[in-house]
Amino acid sequence: MQHYVTPDLCDAYPDLVQVLEPMFSNFGGRDSFGGQIVTIKCFEDNSLVKEQVDLDGKGKVLVVDGGGSLRRALLGDMLAEKAAKNGWEGLVIYGCVRDVDVLVQTDVGVQALASHPMKTDKRGIGDLNVAVTFAGVTFRPGEYVYADNNGVIVSPSPLKMPE
């Protein structure tokens, strides 16, 4: 597992990276994570999140535009454990998570706005692999995202940690 330090990446690639507005907190078992972006756009319905974490996620980060909802949790312990089992590097969720005491022990990165105990509906509503914009940045499928306790950054191409 690669360790990322976003301040070092920002120093090394200042003209390449975009930095998200500082509104995310780390809820996962990994202090840092990064990888190729897979996007989901959904609102209080995590059907597509459930589908994607069942797939091979090696080298990938699931970026979920949940509309910033603070009323439902788009990720909980069961889906986080599936994501870890299937090799996902992490998830960046513009929305809430739950089961935070379990998430912090799960080997997957999770950045989200807050915790909320209520689960979502599963109506099969949402879009996969579309450009999504939140926190002042547009995420495009196939680009790259890196996260740690300092923040979250996006790059059009993969970044290497400076030596």
From Swiss-Prot:
Free-text remark on how the cofactor is bound: Divalent metal cation.
GO BP: regulation of RNA metabolic process
InterPro entries: RraA, RraA/RraA-like, RraA/RraA-like_sf
Enzyme Commission number: 4.1.3.17, 4.1.1.112
Catalytic activity: 4-hydroxy-4-methyl-2-oxoglutarate = 2 pyruvate; oxaloacetate + H(+) = pyruvate + CO2
Residues the entry annotates as binding a divalent metal cation: D99
Keyword Transmembrane: no
Cofactor(s) needed by this chain: a divalent metal cation
GO MF annotation, one: 4-hydroxy-4-methyl-2-oxoglutarate aldolase activity
Keywords: Lyase, Metal-binding
Residues in the signal sequence: none
Pfam family, one: RraA-like
Binding site for substrate: G76, D77, M78, L79, R98
Similarity comment: Belongs to the class II aldolase/RraA-like family.
Subunit structure: Homotrimer.
Known role: Catalyzes the aldol cleavage of 4-hydroxy-4-methyl-2-oxoglutarate (HMG) into 2 molecules of pyruvate. Also contains a secondary oxaloacetate (OAA) decarboxylase activity due to the common pyruvate enolate transition state formed following C-C bond cleavage in the retro-aldol and decarboxylation reactions.
Protein name per Swiss-Prot or TrEMBL: Putative 4-hydroxy-4-methyl-2-oxoglutarate aldolase
Species in which this protein is naturally found: Pseudomonas entomophila (strain L48)
